[in-house]
Amino acid sequence: MKKKLLSLLLALSMVAALAACSAGGAGTPTPTPAAEPTPAVEPTPAPETAPAAPALSGTLKVVATNETYMTLFEKFAAETGVKVELLSMSSGDVLSKLRAEGGTPSADLWFGGGIDAFMSAKDDGLLEQVSFAASSDLADAFKDADGYWFSKGLTIVGFLVNNTLMGELNITAPATWTDLLNSEYKGEIVMSNPAVSGTNYAVVNAMLQKLGGEAGWDYFNSLNENIAFYGKRGSDPKNKVIADEYAVGITYIDGTIEDLLDEYDVSIVYPTDGIPWMPDGVAAFKNADNVEAAKYFIEWLFSSDENLRLLAEIDQKTSVKLIKPNLEGIELDYDTAILLDEDLSLFGAQRTAVLEQFEALMGDKAVND
């Protein structure tokens, strides 16, 4: 059946400050008011298919957030003759691996994961600049001004609640981020380590911006009292909740999470005091063995409505319409009222300082295996 996400994406006006905002003090992001939206412009129809491929060969090695994207890459392989190898890896792990490889990446293309890691990789000189004609159709707020990364959609964050455990524990489901601090949830909340999960890094940085630095860190210190552990994978919270191990998981929300409602006794909660969100990135690695194939894949993806519709089907979300407003065949199904106002420039600029402070906060609750 048709699933409905709450639309929590305030078109482009809520993120128009991306390029203009500057970083605040280390580890203490300061929100910047969103700019007034610009008048609507009649979009130019987008092409249905990508431009003809250049002469490509060899293998395109991809690191992606999961293996469900193979359908998209199989289409690319069929149209170009390039073989594709895909390795599933979280955005934080990709960034750590990139830095460890010292400028000689073992992969060519980075597909998916929180944009904070892509911003940091650009600053470290680890990404390849990509330029193509159709990039002008992409919203400025969701692409790097210099062409080092592009966003393929947005991920939103909420709670997945185990109804059975709620009944057994005689507790009610949390409705807000503030509710998570109630003592009744002690030891019943699972969250992914924000150092490896772009989704949960979005939670941390967005809440720091919402509450302010000192109050924000006070919040996470209090929340830590109720956290059972911080998982190494972004999927850990939902996996532990559907396995009846914990009552509440702080998790990304998309069609795959909504499908769980038909299989398990769980519910989705969209916290009414604000929804954190994070753009998902795409980039080519600098000095990659097959960087030309990686660069063409990015052009191939964003130049074709057909390819973007396939991506939306795989992701089970319509937020790619925000990335490419003239995309045909997809309409947003989102109510944007309670999306948190975020300054994305702080996500990359303060990533290291924020994660260092959060690592100290987690202590031995961070799972490393």
Give, region by region, the residue ranges found by the protein language model.
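A ligand-binding cleft/hinge motif common to bilobed small-molecule-binding domains
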Residues: 116-120, 242, 247-265, 315
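Conserved C-terminal helix/tail region of periplasmic/extracytoplasmic solute-binding proteins
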Residues: 340-369
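Short, polar/charged alpha-helical segment
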Residues: 47-52, 63-85, 99, 159, ...
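Bacterial lipoprotein signal-peptidase II cleavage site
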Residues: 19-36
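Short beta-strand->loop
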Residues: 127-136, 149-150, 178, 264-276, ...
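Extracytoplasmic ligand-binding site segments that recognize negatively charged/polar headgroups
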Residues: 63-70, 92-93, 105-245
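Mature extracytoplasmic/periplasmic domains
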Residues: 280, 285-342
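Periplasmic-binding protein-like
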Residues: 140, 155, 219-223, 230-231, ...
